[in-house]
Amino acid sequence: MKFLIDECLHTSLVQVAQASGYVADHVNYLSLGGLKDWQLLPVIREREYTFVTNNGADFLALFGKEPLHPGIIIIVPNVTPILQRELFKAALGHIGARDLTNCVVEVKYVGDRTVCSQYAFPESTE
C-alpha cells in the first residue's frame, strides 16, 4: 500500500508512513500543490495511492463517483502537525495488512482517545 498525503496535511506524515514500512508521497513533493481536488484524482487512480486528507467532504464526493479506488484516510479534526502525526500513526496501526480497496478510514479524537472507524465507500448495492 502506498499513500499520497494531501497538501492540507503536514509533509512530516510522509516520514511517519515510511517509518512504518509504507511508501508515501506528499502532494507538494510531486509538484501537485495548488491543483483542484478533481485534478488530483487521475494521479491517485493511475498510481493507486491510498489518499490521506483532512478534506473529507470534498474527496468523499469525488471518490463516491469512482467504481473502484484504493482507499482514503480522513484525519477528521484540523489539528497541529504533532497531532496529525499521532492520528496518522493510529490509522496505520488500525490498517495493518488490511485491504482498503473501496474503503474509508476516519481517525479522530473522542475525548482523550483516538478512534478509527472503517467503512465501505461507496456502499455496495449488492
Regions picked out by a protein language model, each given a short descriptive name:
Residues 2-50:
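N-terminal first-folded block
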